A protein has these predicted regions:
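Alpha-helical scaffolds flanking conserved acidic
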Residues: 1-4
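Hydrophobic helix-and-loop "lid/oligomerization" segment in the mid-to-C-terminal part
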Residues: 7-174
Length: 174
């Protein structure tokens, strides 16, 4: 499980890898079931997973290089993160925010100057919580309102991300 988790979080050791990740992979190599890891890494999608991707694709909005996408209600956390990684495949996108209504927010960044963990922490300050690493982070905003209030909250969250990213970009130009 540890080996698979490290490989998933680092996109098969190609993103955000640290020395500890490599040491753990090396130590666990002979202890883990390589066939099981292959099966897990190459597993097929469930229909529900495909629907989450479909919802995200149909809802995506891109502002400069920032994408926002909605996977629908109660999407599993791992799938939200996977969709967020998928959104980074777009040429126009280098910072991705993907959320599941009433669930989680996943953030990914390909730009060294845009630290996903710091940005989500600042964007959600006072309304929720978030944090993580420079290239990937997650967060949550507790909410029990109706659909109209939820739409307003999502718009507020988008504006917060855009504001924090704009301020971060301006600081990096100094």
């Amino acid at each position: 499980a540890l080996t698979f988790g490290i490989r998933m979080d680092t996109q098969k050791l190609s993103r955000g890898v640290c020395k500890m990740d490599m040491e753990m992979i090396w130590r666990m190599f002979d202890l883990c079931d390589q066939d099981m890891i292959y099966l897990l890494e190459n597993s097929t999608l469930y229909f529900e997973d495909l629907m989450a991707y479909s919802k995200a694709i149909s809802s995506i909005e891109v502002f400069e290089n920032i994408s926002f996408a909605d996977t629908g209600r109660d999407c599993p956390e791992a799938l939200i993160a996977s969709v967020s990684d998928f959104m980074l495949a777009l040429v126009e996108v280098s910072f991705s925010v993907v959320y599941s209504r009433k669930k989680e927010i996943s953030v990914r960044s390909e730009r060294p100057t845009l630290d996903a963990g710091k940005i989500i922490s600042k964007a959600l300050k006072g309304i929720g919580s978030g944090g993580g690493h420079a290239t990937m982070a997650g967060g949550f905003v507790p909410f029990d309102g109706n659909d109209r209030e939820e739409d307003l909250m999502i718009q507020n969250i988008r504006e917060r991300f855009i504001d924090v990213i704009s301020r971060t970009k301006r600081k990096s130009l100094r």
